[in-house]
Amino acid sequence: MKLVTFEADGTVKHGRLSDGTIEELGDGDLAAIVAGASADGAAVATHAEADVTILAPLLNPPKVLCVAANYQEHITEGGGDPVDKKRIAPKMFIKPHTALCGPGDVFEIPEISAAADWEVELCAVIGREARGVSADEALSYVFGYTTSNDISLRKLAMGYERDIVGNVAFFDWLEGKWADNSAPIGPYLVTADEIGDPQTLPIQLWVNGELKQDLTTANMIFTVAELVAFCSRLCTLVPGDVILTGTPSGVGATTGTYLNDGDEMIAEVGPCGRLVTPVRGTSSPAD
């Protein structure tokens, strides 16, 4: 089942999507459905998808969790060595709520950045409270999946000279994940039963029509199940939490090609829909 949050007549609503028609189920986003309310009820109205504005499936998720370096190809393109997953743990971080946005929302390059980059990712949405679950049972806690783009600022221009020593470079990387609208998700939330195995999905991203990233989720180092299980050991996962599961190779940093005013990104993961993000703003000089 494909579910959407949308705006019609100035009101946020949610519903089922099929063949370009939305069967409206009620007001608000999909949070109640994700938490256990039925999505099988009778429609209160119908809308043509083209006549409404599709929003992020969840407008205020409790947590936006992300993993770094979860595809060997992405590690290799950045100059890293092959990894043995038995000897490492997932590298998790959190994005602020202000990073989250939906399809068609503009990403404005902040003045502090000279190098805004793209990262298409599969996003898993938690549907049940999970604490200390095993990888074998972890997928039963996932409500569904959507497309995401972990837009990242590779360089920060602080406006003064700095010594890049110690852990400064790490914190620059971390803070480069915080920009407003740098975590678009959508357009559809596809229920887990329809996806089946999340490790079989094509994952792609285009910039201005040029294919930049093209791989499959089978190439993840840590599977979705392993990531959910690991995160549930760190903290309690609750319905509506979203987990961005890492990006494949093909990011702009590899060639020094970054986003500019007027660019358009299109991210797509299997049946989760094409997530369009227009880019505005002019980058400032880097340190």
Task: Label each PLM-derived region with a short phrase.
Residues 6, 15-18, 94, 103, ...:
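Short beta-strand-to-turn element immediately C-terminal to the catalytic PLP-Schiff-base lysine
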Residues 86-104:
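A gly/proline- and charged-residue-enriched helix-loop-helix capping module
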